[in-house]
Amino acid sequence: MLAFVFRRVLQSVVVLFVMSLIVFSMINLVGDPVDMLVNPESLPDEIERVRRDFGLDQPAYVQYWKFLTGALSGDLGNSFVFGRPALSLIVERFPATLELATFALIIAIMIGLPLGIYAGLNPSGWGTRIIMGSSILGISIPTFWLGLMMIIVFSVLLGWLPVSGRGEIGSFLGIESSVFTLDGLRHIIMPATNLALFKIAMVIRLTRAGTEEVMRLDFIKFARARGLSPRRIVRFHLLPNILIPIITVLAIEFGTLIAFATVTESIFAWPGLGKLVIDAIINLDRPIVVAYLLFVVTLFLILNLVVDIIYAVLDPRVRLGGSEK
């Protein structure tokens, strides 16, 4: 176990270094931040002073070396727009995005899992055709279009839910979240559902495939021969066997929910990482964009490691070292 973790940490360090080089190189090819920071009518001396203050007058390799040495000590630079450390802004906005992604994942599991099991147990029924057709639709609908339609229907026409924002934040056991207040719940329902739609479709398809595969196995036939009820078979024999691959996939997909919440957060003005990054891209705020991308890469690396360990714990047939005992 320790050897595996150590090896994965070393691999992660290499991946982070390569990604930092790629991200820093690509972001330096996109526009000049000074154009966004100064008045177009400013004198050349003023423009040069701003460029010098932010270290943009130095060669790219010098800028990258300073960034790399700073990153090793947790300093990813200061935001050009906010004048604050980029990493502190990321950490400050992360709880809102984490809350949104977690709520979206819960919605995806609560809706997708039972529908997928039903579709797997009734492969030729009309209900299954409707469910699977809807899952294809859920994968195909653009997130931004669905978000706008939800706002028009549930906020503008019906007036049931607020258009934007995070709402009132409550506290429970020292954890602050908008889901602990009624106003916060009303604010999170639409953006979380919008973010969860694609994952609902994915969970349905994963669960259906797993259910159909497991129901053909001998131990299920034996359970039926013993006279066990369908509900008991599903609860004690089907679920434990289909949850392992679903959990491992969803752990990685949780990272994608955080990484790709950008569109949803922009539509619903959710004060998380996505909105911060969109504003940073518009203003060519390089430190924020670089810090965000490296933060997401680190998150994915951690999730991958955790998934591998969980998978080995849940399934004794799996060995982290790649060998069987």
Residues of each region from the PLM?
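Membrane-water interface segments at the C-terminal ends of transmembrane alpha-helices
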Residues: 22-29, 58, 67-69, 134-165, ...
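Short hydrophobic, aromatic-rich alpha-helical segments embedded in or entering the lipid bilayer
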Residues: 42-75, 220, 268-280
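Membrane-interfacial helix-loop-helix junctions in multi-pass membrane proteins
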Residues: 52-60, 77-86, 168-188, 281-287
